[in-house]
Amino acid sequence: MASIFSKIISKEIPCYKIAENKEFIAFLDINPNSTGHTLCIPKIEVDDFLDLEKESYNKLMSFSRDVALAIKKVIPCKRIGMSLIGLEVPHVHVHIIPISSMEDMQFVKKIKLNHKQFDSLAKEINAAYSLSNSI
């Protein structure tokens, strides 16, 4: 059964896209822990990251790192946190979260952004990503 992420990949559902290549896509989480909270996912539908081939896992981590570097250029934060949980959506996804405290990684407090804020943020992070990955 297709997950919501598969529907984003197939463009049945829109997203605030940050980056994309032939294997992965990154987009803003619409229920973010902090401004810039992004999800990086493989385009193949795999439930658990342990089920990814080692090469695909390594490529996902590399892609996620590139996305995190772009986010760090745009969002003021102390660090970029990363988490693989996968309990809510049965599709491997890496949370890339700008953090200033441990609380930002707890998935309890959420922030609200409107469409205009999400759209502007996605464009800004995408520009930073594109600039860094155009070499």
Residue ranges and their predicted role:
Residues 1-135:
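HIT superfamily nucleotide-processing domains
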